[in-house]
Swiss-Prot record:
Protein name listed in UniProt: Portal protein
Superkingdom field: Viruses
Entry-linked InterPro entries: Herpes_Portal
Subunit structure, interactors included: Homododecamerizes. Interacts with terminase subunits TRM1 and TRM3.
Family designation: Belongs to the herpesviridae portal protein family.
One cellular-component annotation, GO: virion component
Source species taxonomy: Viruses, Duplodnaviria, Heunggongvirae, Peploviricota, Herviviricetes
Keywords: Host nucleus, Viral genome packaging, Viral release from host cell, Virion
Organism: Human herpesvirus 6A (strain Uganda-1102) (HHV-6 variant A)
GO process annotations (BP): chromosome organization
Cited function: Forms a portal in the viral capsid through which viral DNA is translocated during DNA packaging. Assembles as a dodecamer at a single fivefold axe of the T=16 icosahedric capsid. Binds to the molecular motor that translocates the viral DNA, termed terminase.
One Pfam entry name: Herpes_UL6
Compartment(s): Virion; Host nucleus
Amino acid sequence: MHRASANSLLNSVSGSMMWRNQSSGRRPSKRLSDNEATLSTINSILGAEDMLSKNLLSYLPPNNEEIDMIYPSEQIMTFIEMLHGHKNFFKGQTIHNALRDSAVLKKQIAYGVAQALLNSVSIQQIHDEWKRHVRSFPFHNKKLSFQDYFSVWAHAIKQVILGDISNIINFILQSIDNSHYNRYVDWICTVGIVPFMRTTHTAPNLYNLLQQVSSKLIHDIVRHKQNIVTPVLLGLSSVIIPDFHNIKIFRDRNSEQISCFKNKKAIAFFTYSTPYVIRNRLMLTTPLAHLSPELKKHNSLRRHQKMCQLLNTFPIKVLTTAKTDVTNKKIMDMIEKEEKSSDAKKSLIKFLLNLSDSKSKIGIRDSVEGFIQEITPSIIDQNKLMLNRGQFRKRSAIDTGERDVRDLFKKQIIKCMEEQIQTQMDEIETLKTTNQMFERKIKDLHSLLETNNDCDRYNPNLDHDLENLSLSRALNIVQRLPFTSVSIDDTRSVANSFFSQYIPDTQYADKRIDQLWEMEYMRTFRLRKNVNNQGQEESITYSNYSIELLIVPFLRRFLNIYNLESIPEEFLFLSLGEILLAIYESSKIKHYLRLVYVRELNQISEVFNLTQTHPENSEPIFDSNIFSPNPENEILEKIKRIRNLRRIQHLTRPNYPKGDQD
């Protein structure tokens, strides 16, 4: 039910109830309660209607599988941050800013309005201006030639016309909001769909505009050509292109229709580049969508560089390693430093260390012999073993028998020790193999456990915070990252070591991403790179192709301006004053002035009998230089040089249909 029909129904129902209540015999309180109930019901219906029209999006299911959300998305938000240098700087940002230049739009409107107004001047209007001038300041042929007389008026009328046209254009350009065109370019480069809204404005009053005009000629032209000025003023004041806040754009999978909402209210939109659906996945066709894979790779490399910079340049870093190769030597030194008195524990430890260092059978025998010699004084009586000379001869026979016993004892001890040591060595090797097997299993379990815990210990916002945090905070965060220690087996050695600083170099990657960004923009929008004689880039400007691709759709689809001629590319290198001067030189006014000059000169010649020197030739004297002064020639020559230097080609403007897409 529409609002108008509902209101009419409300009025009719109220009137009918009042008539019925007056004619019936019911009590006033009863009639009043019925009246209020009916009115309350109708008001509830109207309120529900308004709520439904304003909050249409809220009635959609939150997880509707039949809808592809185009915007907002994480990818597009990343694109917007890249374009405006939120985190990093790219060369593509400067190219994008050149594309957002609203000065091109202003020059286009100035050129189109000036071209339409100046070419709408009729020869009758020029002749009327001449007659008014003659009546105010007639020609008397006293020390003043007619050529000078007409030349002064022609230059004066030119300055008046250009001044009034300039005032009109400045008045129009003041109503241009630069942000609308900037957002238009941002939407095209990121999403490819431009939402917009129109405000209800009545036809603009030309009174304020006509206050900028001083001549009757331009005053009449503006009134006669209201279809030129009025649409421009109305279009500039009625269109609103929103930013990226509170905008939702989605695509219905069933109907394949795109819808756009702002604050849960449907708004119009213009599809510049239609998104595709490939393998049930929505794919954008914008320049930044084409660059997205390379931008992600480059961003990942930059984060890696930053992390390596923080990790490998930390002020204090100490690397430690075990020194097991000198442990035995230290033990021996400690034993030697102890007191020289015999100790069974010390002797036994020294004996075992000597055995572990022995690599051959002879070494083991020497170790055992030394051990026996060391402990022999404590178990054998030295007085009995070492006799004096007087008793030596008496004990000689006994010594031979004891020596045989000692040799036999040594051999038995050595044999027992060898067997025991061999048994111990075999057992040690078996235990070492078993230990290595269990160590590998434990390492695998630790690795799995640390892998599962890394997700909890790693901060997902670290990638975005590293570039923006202070150095001290970034270092503290990076130091808390999970690391895995690696154990090296005895049979392996370390082949490399990061004792020196390691930071990846991104110079080649930066240069490559800049080239890709420049290539995408230059070829998509056909921008023109201007270089000097040494081949160095001076600027990036619009070309004729760029104007047709961006400016013309903006004028037609958003401003509803269809009758402005596209500005030539060479005019983009001129100022507004030079543009007006160049348009004036190529307009019909110059030819009309020439015609009026010839006609008036013939009449003056008949009146004052002004002829050339040869009486047989009665043609009037004609000085064409008054219509071709030097400044105008300089402007035309400048345009010619620009056209030849840039090798500019002109295109035929496409015919865009009228109407907005809702």
